[in-house]
Amino acid sequence: MNIYFGKKIPITTCQIFDNEKKEFVKATCYEYDCQDKSDFTEIKKLDDGWTYKQETLDNMKRKFTANKNGINSEIAIFSLENKDGEILGLCNAENKKRTMEVRFLESKQDGRHKYVGQTLLASIGKEMLKNKQQKNFIIKTAIASAYDFYEKTCGFMMDSIFNCDLIMGRIGTYKFIKQTQERTQCPIIDLKV
């Protein structure tokens, strides 16, 4: 049993490419448990260049309230951070019984790092695969400019059955994780038991 005294739980370690250093650097994917209000501090400190900063804070508050009232919340908030603790990517999802549904994904828009969104999604996919009941990895509402990323880079497919934009099954998720590990020249290593 892992016990964490911080405000976030490490999920995976991985690598992303630093365009300034021209090399791969270590990164860690975290999940915020929203057990106390200190969890909001890092997100509040983000600059206003983050499109989904307020939505992330709102979802954290919803999860905090649910936790406080003893209700199991499906909201899942993930971040990808470099070794200095700088947030490079954010993802808000719903961790449902049979699906992991990504509501929005965003990476820092400074152009310094490559593979942030892909690595964050692959880390979340790896977390999803641990739940044997979850069958599909879903992008619920992708913005038009992100379709190339989700379809061509990650391998999600257009959906006509579920009420969502893009979908990937378990086999596709395994392939996507493998492809991401090859691109980033590093395994995505589980930290959460």
Model feature map: region roles:
Residues 1-112, 123-138, 147-148, 152-193:
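Non-catalytic substrate-recognition and accessory regions of acyl/acetyltransferase enzymes
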